[in-house]
Amino acid sequence: MQIEQLSFVGRRSDPSMFGIASVLEYQFGSGQLRLASVDPFDAPIVENRFCEDDRDATRLARCFRDSLEFVYAGELADMIEEIRFPKDPKNLSDSDLADLCRRFSGSGYHPSGTVKTGAANDPLAVLDESGCCRFMDGLAVADASIMPTVPRANTNLTSIMIGEMIGEALRVHPARYGL
């Protein structure tokens, strides 16, 4: 879990406003991504299912409570004039916070693990161990979609390393990639 400061939240008319987000980097629950139709131009159906698993709602509520405690502690407490959401946060029970998390959880837009990598005999594996697509010559994938699990941190650094590794493999073994 992490606590993120969001300086761009609520800045329509009040530049002194900021937000704090409680972030659950690893979830027990999972969503689903499905094709809406055979038409490649139709947007896929995305079902996030945030906090559907009670363990996720409980953990995110705990992080939310920690975020609130952070706001009320030390130097930051003297700078906070008002908390706009949730109203009256000190009086919310753990159950109330979990319900709040279920209703208002959203994505940080770091999807990963959507393209399976595996052995040639795995019918669900789209990519081989080099990142080459089994069904389209000349296509390699080098991003967060090939991660087998969601990392417990922001996906940026991990994605950069995947790109570096596949880029180096391309340089050293170009024939493997059809070059």
Segments predicted by a language model, with ranges:
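FAD-dependent oxidoreductase catalytic-site/capping-region signature
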Residues: 1-158, 166-179
